[in-house]
Amino acid sequence: MSQLPIPLPLNESRWRYVTASGGGMTVAFLAGSGGSITLLSPEGENVSFRYGGVGGGIGLGMRLPRFGKVNLNVKGKSVGGAGALEALPSTGTVLVADGLVGRDLSRGDFTGPCMYVELGAGVIAGGSGTAILFGLDPKLLAAVALASASPLTAALGASMSRQLLQSSRGALLMAGVNVGAQFGGGAAAYLGALF
């Protein structure tokens, strides 16, 4: 069996996904998104978290049709956006990192820096999936950002990125229905926070 380039052993948590809502927008390759996630704690309490981030992405699609006088065009750049309400169908799983030996996640493990990836496709209505690594080490994150800022230290930043991803307390995997100004598909990676 081949080893993943960034091994992060995960197990299912006793926290359960309840629902989520969110939205995002892209202009050319720049992306931003945010939302709300509701989880059921092992004690049976609904706990809400907010998240947001900025990043970059790629997409493949066709030009959106013109709606009356509304033309979603920014001089030579593609623009898109989609969102999901809690009422729309969605599903998810909460995973805990093996590094939390002998215990499950606590509320504090979820908050702090996070990295996430979103994949989506649709024609007005569509579907999307999100994978969030949460509870990243903030000191490692700052070190990776500094090291990656210069071509002279980029190799150091790349090796520290592996440590940063392995510092994660867990992961959230979510998928659901969305609606918006979309006519194709795309993927984006974000750096943000869960709070």
Swiss-Prot record:
The chain crosses the membrane at residues 20-40, 116-136, 140-160, 171-191. Disruption phenotype: Deletion mutant together with deletion of its cognate immunity protein Tsi4 leads to a significant loss of fitness advantage when placed in competition with parental strains. GO terms for cellular component: extracellular region; host cell membrane; membrane. It is found in: Host membrane; Secreted. Its main location: host cell. Keywords: Host membrane, Membrane, Secreted, Transmembrane, Transmembrane helix, Virulence. Toxin secreted by the H1 type VI (H1-T6SS) secretion system into the periplasm of recipient cells. This is Toxin protein Tse4. It comes from Pseudomonas aeruginosa (strain ATCC 15692 / DSM 22644 / CIP 104116 / JCM 14847 / LMG 12228 / 1C / PRS 101 / PAO1).
